[in-house]
């Protein structure tokens, strides 16, 4: 049985004072009872604070990105081992903002996922289509192509210690949300595509939904059989809203 996972992606938001207030409030709220696994992904500069702020809590933490290089002369980059030093359990790779704003390719995303696993960090591999691609009815081709980059580089066994996040790009930060049925259709597609190579891994694979998830739509989305949690953006910056989503997950 899959344990639901809810991950808060803070993006480029926060300050030391704001983070402390948010996490203190979040910790208190979580004590009310949440059975889903929960994690937050703050900006790099705040990762070192997470251990002290979250010590003794049920909340894990992770990073929003990493280098595909393991060490070396790469100014401004963050090595996987550095994230491991800071206690990261997860790292987001291939978020649509990284793909669209910074030109990250499918192959680069796959490389990042694999180097994360080398230091026992679980990559959250993001896939999803643009509005234009959806209107052209090529969602299936796009998502399979993105998944295949990982499968071809490392094989299906790499997904034993990975999470997939489906984020329809047209629903991120736009206020638009895929209907539960639209989201479920793509989640089922992802699981069935992996199952072609290994049905056991496919059955255990966590597939999160990310795309304007809020407290008022989380229950419907997370009730779908192949949606195992959420990758939450803006709503993760509000403790009560985030708690509502976590409770809806399990």
Swiss-Prot record:
Catalytic activities: D-glyceraldehyde 3-phosphate = dihydroxyacetone phosphate
A GO molecular-function annotation: triose-phosphate isomerase activity
UniProt keyword list: Cytoplasm, Gluconeogenesis, Glycolysis, Isomerase
Source domain of life: Bacteria
Single GO biological process annotation from the record: gluconeogenesis
Pathway annotation from the record: Carbohydrate biosynthesis; gluconeogenesis; Carbohydrate degradation; glycolysis; D-glyceraldehyde 3-phosphate from glycerone phosphate: step 1/1
Keyword Flavoprotein part of the UniProt annotation: no
EC numbers, comma separated: 5.3.1.1
Binding site for substrate: 9-11, 173, 212, 233-234
Gene Ontology cellular component terms for the protein in this record: cytosol
Active site: 95, 167
SUPFAM superfamilies reported in the protein's UniProt record: Triosephosphate isomerase (TIM)
Keyword Lipoprotein attached: no
Pfam families for the chain: TIM (PF00121)
Subcellular locations according to the entry: Cytoplasm
Xref: InterPro entries: Aldolase_TIM, TIM_sf, TrioseP_Isoase_bac/euk, Triosephosphate_isomerase, Triosephosphate_isomerase_AS
The protein's role, per its UniProt record: Involved in the gluconeogenesis. Catalyzes stereospecifically the conversion of dihydroxyacetone phosphate (DHAP) to D-glyceraldehyde-3-phosphate (G3P).
UniProt xrefs under HAMAP family: TIM_B
Family: Belongs to the triosephosphate isomerase family.
Assembly, per entry: Homodimer.
PANTHER family named in the record: TRIOSEPHOSPHATE ISOMERASE (PTHR21139:SF42)
Name of protein: Triosephosphate isomerase
């Amino acid at each position: 049985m899959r344990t639901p996972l809810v991950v808060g992606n803070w993006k480029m938001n926060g300050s030391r004072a704001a983070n402390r207030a948010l996490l203190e409030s979040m910790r208190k709220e979580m004590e009310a009872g949440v059975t889903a696994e929960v994690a937050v992904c703050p900006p790099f500069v705040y990762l070192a604070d997470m251990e002290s702020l979250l010590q003794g809590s049920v909340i894990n933490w992770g990073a929003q990105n990493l280098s595909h290089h393991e060490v070396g002369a790469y100014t401004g980059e963050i090595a996987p081992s550095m994230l491991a030093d800071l206690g990261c359990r997860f790292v987001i790779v291939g978020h649509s903002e990284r793909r669209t704003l910074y030109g990250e390719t499918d192959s680069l995303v796959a490389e990042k996922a694999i180097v994360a696993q080398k230091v026992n960090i679980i990559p959250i591999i993001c896939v999803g289509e643009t509005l234009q691609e959806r209107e052209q009815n090529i969602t299936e081709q796009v998502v399979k192509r993105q998944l295949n980059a990982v499968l071809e580089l490392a094989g299906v066994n790499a997904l034993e210690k990975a999470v997939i996040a489906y984020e329809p790009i047209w629903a991120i930060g736009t206020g638009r949300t895929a209907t539960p049925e639209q989201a479920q259709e793509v989640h089922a597609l992802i699981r069935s595509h992996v199952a072609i190579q290994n049905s056991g891994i496919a059955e255990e694979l966590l597939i999160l939904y990310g795309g304007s998830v809020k407290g008022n739509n989380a229950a419907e989305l997370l009730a779908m059989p192949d949606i195992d949690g959420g990758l939450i953006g803006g709503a993760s910056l509000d403790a009560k809203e985030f708690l509502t989503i976590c409770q809806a997950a399990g």
